[in-house]
Structures are given as structure tokens and as C-alpha cells.
Amino acid sequence: YLLRERKIDIKHFVLQTYTYSFENHHCFADGLDDVCSRVTHLKNTVFDFRRFLSDFSAILYDLFIWHLYFQNADPVLFSQFEFDAYISLSNSKAFPLVYDNGARALDELRMRVERKIKYLGRKYPHADLAIVREKYRELGLKPDNVYFFIRGHNLYDLISIVCKEVCKAMLRTAKKNKVVTHDMVSELYRRRNNLDYELRQNIKYGAYFPIRKLEQDIREFLGEN
């Protein structure tokens, strides 16, 4: 969407997602509590998805601007593949991704991103990023919503991992607080396989700019405007 590929519009019978891909829509932050609740049948009180994705986006924003700059100037110098490596976050049994709302993983990402930004700033001191920021701001890109515009498959994989970890944390908390019995927890763990299905149902119509634009195009295509 941001690179404005030709003929991807309603006039050419192609619906624009107004994100990188439709998978980004499934990762909309405001719907992820519901995803985890449908999987576990519990209320999410252990993780703030909105804050996590806002922080994640803010960390990536300046580096993403550099990436967009090079997509127009010379893609080889900062390729899609190289940028996509920054979408993944560390997750281990010793340091679960969701601990402290992802703070440890986000701090590690921030350090990696800052190193790359400093390197690019030194190597290309005359790059005019202000023009790039303004150009893409007009298309809807802001520091808190970068996750809509990065590669959807990578983002979806990340959010799937986060949701799985959140569901496990919800179940552990419920068991610890004796909200559920052991048998109920076992049954809920068996149901965790439904997470991918539930994540793909995460569409919040009318809730944010890209989906509203897509809905508008569908109405136009159907002649309802």
C-alpha cells in the first residue's frame, strides 16, 4: 500500500488492503484480548496488547522510515529481507516474550534498531527523511501504527507467538488463583489449538483507518455509495 503499486485499486477490480497485507488486519491490537478470551474462556488481565503494539511500532518507526527511503532510492542498500529481521522478537522459557508486557524483548529490539539507525545516519548523512515522514504520514503512517505496514506474514507469526504465550499465562494465573479446576485447565490447554482460527477471525470493522478505507471501497464496488 505505502509503495503505491499501480493498478491495485477498485478501478482495476483489485481491493487495496491499505496495510501491507490482510494478515496485518488480523493483528489489530484492540481485538487481541477477545482472541485470547475466546481460546481460554477467561478474561485477559495479564497483557496489554495495545501498549505492546504501540511500543513495538514506535521502536520500529524511524528504522521503517529509513527502509522506505531506500525502497525509493536503492532497495539493495536496505532490503525488505534485512528490515524483516527486525520484526522478530526473542522468546525463551527463561525469558518469555510476554514477561513485563514484552519489556525485555522490546528493549533488545530497541538496542538493535538504534545501532542500525546510527549506522545509517553516519553512512548517509544527506538523506532527507523529513520528506519521507511527511509523504507517508499523509498515507496514514504514524509512530504508533507501524505494525499495519510491515510485512504481514512476519507480523502474524509474531502475534501468534505472543497470543499463545498470553493464553498460557492466563491459564497459569487462573490455576494459581483457583479460578478453574485442574480438569478445566487441562481442557483449556487442549483448546489452545484453536488460536490460529480465532486470530483469523480478528476483524474489527469500522474500528480503524485502513479497515474503514477497505469497507468504503467494497461499498463503492457494490454500488452502495
Locations of the language-model features?
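Acidic, divalent-metal-binding catalytic cores of TOPRIM
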Residues: Y1-N225
